[in-house]
């Protein structure tokens, strides 16, 4: 007989004593996570994980870990949460305002790790000596810290969060890209295992830097990010990587905005002109200039850029000026005055017919040049990108190549999933007026058993149901995954309501009137294939005396004799 692990009654202390319909409907998702007992906020941006939330967090972590080990071929480590100032100075990231900084008793400075590029590179420097030691991918699942100025969105954007961060090391660009593709495939499998609808989008790697870059998002109206999706070719890109064109060029005659930039050698002043009601897209601007822009001046005001230009060029009269015109402008557009008083027209160059502003809804897709773009609000949950030698070079991580030369820097990649953020995002995705709806793989429990008040008859029925489930060989994965202990003061209706609010996919209702038949209320969402259970139902309903109905609230209910309960639950869980 399989042994069933019962829950300690002390866990009830973290459950809500009551849940009103108004609370379930009106609270934000992040507030409801606290009310139902998944987390509790201790300070702004800081959360304590309670038993329910920790179970879900650990299940997501294990799902990620399983794929990283089996498909990603990665090796797990655990780095210190405290990193030295020297490492971050070497990569010119110490002045990042989001770092939590601290000193020891001797005055030495450290930071709490927000990411671990510096530390993992410094670690692997001790173990990579030859090209034969690569490719290799290292990962960890640890807490990270960011001093967010305005933490918001609960566990979606806190000052402390659990993150899976992986780093690949390769001897050449080809192997580095192969690692990128391997982890891209692994990430797709991770999110498919979680049975959640996700999209991947080409993206900008941001301040961390890098070449190939892809983000993974959950589509939801509450998301802070915007993706642009083409209805024709299916391309999905982040807003900063999406290129669009108007229906017809040169149709904008209104006020024009201008942003100044310099080429990398500061010999040429670049003037980007675009409609005043649009936002300059720096990635598109870079493409228009074949990457020849000094991005350190990107966020500087125009006056500052002009001062640098005048300082670095002896005679402005003979210096080069390049105008880059967005394709929406025409000769009648209201251009701002040119700031330089002395210049030669012969030194002016011009690039026209390029799109250099953020895409908008219904504009033409820059990828296929046929379809229309549609904006999608989303929540970013993962990001993978190649780093090149951005970190291996300043930290001097070299290796002996095939020619026996020790002059080549390691090629790196970075692969992150916000684990705690993912829990918060899925909470948003599956939330309804009754609470949460989790995929079975990450629900705090897969099954709940709800009975009436404690008395000998109800206790015996509860034991019979548990024995039927846990003595079935096919139900071994339900060990320690059944919630049957509730506050004794809660009636059967309140227990069912609490189970639904917690998002437990299946609620087994054991009542005296229907016994020895039991009811199963389906709370889980069938995120993937929706009809697997129905095929089994049509095939075996007579054999198992299995009935399926929907009540007046649209809740799917299954009725089955206790001796067939395990088989039916096994079928129902497969597509949740």
Swiss-Prot record:
- Per the UniProt record, the source organism is Saccharomyces cerevisiae (strain ATCC 204508 / S288c) (Baker's yeast)
Say which family it is in. Answer: Belongs to the class-II aminoacyl-tRNA synthetase family.
Further facts: Present with 477 molecules/cell in log phase SD medium.
Which PANTHER family does this chain map to?
MITOCHONDRIAL RIBOSOME PROTEIN L39/PROLYL-TRNA LIGASE FAMILY MEMBER (PTHR42753), PROLINE--TRNA LIGASE (PTHR42753:SF2)
Q: Which GO terms describe its cellular component?
A: mitochondrion
Gene Ontology MF: a single term: proline-tRNA ligase activity
Main enzyme class: ligase
GO BP: any one term: prolyl-tRNA aminoacylation
Q: What is its EC number?
A: 6.1.1.15
Instruction: Report the protein name in the record.
Output: Probable proline--tRNA ligase, mitochondrial
Pfam families recorded: tRNA-synt_2b (PF00587)
